Amino acid sequence: PLYNHRLYSGFGRGDFFEAKELDKGIVRLKTLYEKVPPIGSIFISKGEYLFNRQSPAFRVFKSKNLLFKQINVHHAGAMGLIAERSADITLDGFNVVLREGSDRGVTTTADATHFCNCKGEITIRNCTFENMLDDATNIHGTYARVKKVINDNQIAYETYHPHQKDYLFGEKGDSVQIVDQKTLM
């Protein structure tokens, strides 16, 4: 059965569990919550923030005209596929699924698929995404803060989200759009 996991989840609150192994396979978790999950519940952890997205099944960077066909990802310690600064990608039968007969509860510890700063067409067809700990897909660009306007053609920028560490935001020849942080206009 599915339970109201929000009653027991610390996502977004910065709560961490203190864990102590009492016996082989028996762990006591101390929490601030008044309610505890029902006996028999399965505890699933994504791992420590900023260290839980380091092992995608596939990483694509600066590539184009790709076809991922009839691929099954059964587990990854991050996304099933992350594509950055690439173009024209087709997923046809790219499945993020539990292996048949597996007793695992999780496929990927993040999104099944993630496309960042890609261009052209991204096609997803005949795919199944299940049991991941985040979204089926994310397709987006990237925001960065303008730190300084150098001249009419140059800016200095800074990234601010922890997942953007060492991220290649732009290159010579790229065009950027300046928007207001509050209105995105």
Language model segments and positions:
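Extracellular polysaccharide-degrading/modifying enzymes targeting complex plant/algal/animal polysaccharides
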Residues: 1-74, 99-105, 130-185
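Extracellular beta-strand-rich solenoid/capping regions of secreted or surface-exposed proteins
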Residues: 52-63, 78-86, 113-117
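Residues that flank catalytic or metal-binding motifs in active/ligand-binding sites
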Residues: 87, 109, 133
